[in-house]
A protein has these predicted regions:
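Catalytic alpha/beta core domains of metabolic enzymes, predominantly
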Residues: 61-189
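Surface-exposed amphipathic alpha-helical tracts and adjacent flexible/coil segments at the periphery
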Residues: 1-18, 115-119, 170-196, 209
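Active-site beta->alpha loop and helix N-cap motifs at the rims of alpha/beta catalytic domains
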Residues: 3, 10-75
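Catalytic cores of large soluble enzymes that bind and process phosphate-bearing ligands
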Residues: 18-25, 81-84, 116-120, 167, ...
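Conserved acidic residues
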Residues: 51, 156, 202
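Extended, charge-rich alpha-helical interface modules
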Residues: 178-273
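Short hydrophobic/charged patches on amphipathic alpha-helices used for structural packing
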Residues: 43-44, 147, 195
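Glycine-rich, proline-tolerant flexible connector loops at the mouths of alpha/beta enzymes
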Residues: 13-31, 164-167, 219-230
Length: 273
């Protein structure tokens, strides 16, 4: 469970709705996590024990409860109702702000289709980010395999089912790390944010370097002459030139020694196998 909601995160939470008010909130909220209340009766325990509140898609138009939640002063995640428009969704965030709480994060929860499935609307997610200027999560509870697509579309984080398996959580975190490194364009404003962004880029870079080394090993096995003796310097120059088009600030002069080190590491690895 996360105690704070930062961008590029995976958030787990607990919902009190399935218990229909039959179980006291005190028995279910046992740590700093995000909680979806069943009714206003749950709010005192949430205020005392929770790190934040989830305004679930099923009751985002219960404006009395929305206002009461906002007055707790905790961070709020506003899920979009499955049939709610963009304006209705953003309007709930405005209700929270009107109560003096601007700690609002939006969460795209999907639209119910004619097949009775709920499908994420990534276009609406991007529109919500552009219109509101707020972080927007993607609820991938129904299909955690959509995590990479959601992050690539610009989601600032993912919301998983309270019952998500450890494997689903691990896969979602990997999607946030790898795809977040490629999709994130907002400049960090603090040192911890900047370091976290660099860590994500480094993780993605390590994954790509490992994959490149594997492919280089395949190439060595297919070439008539492999290893250092079979290096194709002209191809390597073309590779660096092509990379410089993607990384013009680094340019060929800086990229050349980097790629030489990468290529030599791959060749040595191939020789060791």
């Amino acid at each position: 469970m996360t105690s704070t909601l930062e961008t590029r995160t995976v958030t787990r939470w607990v919902s009190l709705r399935p218990h229909h008010g039959q179980v006291p909130a005190e028995d279910l909220v046992d740590g700093p996590l995000y909680v979806e209340p069943f009714s206003a009766a749950d709010l005192p325990a949430i205020a005392e024990r929770a790190a934040g509140v989830v305004i679930g898609s099923a009751w985002m138009q219960d404006f009395q409860l929305v206002r009461a939640v906002a007055r707790l002063g905790l961070p709020v995640i506003v899920q979009r109702g499955h049939s709610a428009t963009l304006e209705e969704w953003l309007g709930v965030a405005d209700y929270c702000v009107a109560e003096g709480n601007d700690q609002v994060v939006l969460c795209e929860s999907g639209t119910r289709t004619h097949l009775e499935h709920v499908a994420l609307d990534l276009t609406l997610l991007r529109a919500a980010k552009a219109r509101s200027g707020r972080p927007v999560l993607a609820d991938v509870s129904g299909d955690p395999s959509l995590a990479p697509a959601a992050i690539a579309a610009g989601a600032d984080g993912l919301l998983l089912s309270p019952s998500a398996s450890d494997a689903d959580v691990a896969a979602a975190r990997e999607a946030v790390t790898l795809f977040g490194a490629l999709a994130g364009h907002e400049p960090p404003t603090t040192l911890p944010e900047a370091r976290a962004a660099i860590d994500r880029v480094d993780a993605a870079l390590a994954t790509l370097l490992e994959r490149r080394a594997e492919l280089a090993g395949v190439v060595q096995s297919l070439k008539p002459v492999g290893g250092f003796a079979g290096r194709d310097m002209e191809r390597e120059r073309q590779l660096v030139a092509a990379m410089a088009l993607r990384a013009p600030k680094l340019g060929e002069e800086r990229l050349a020694p980097i790629m030489n080190a990468v290529i030599e590491a791959g060749l040595r690895l191939a020789e060791e196998r």
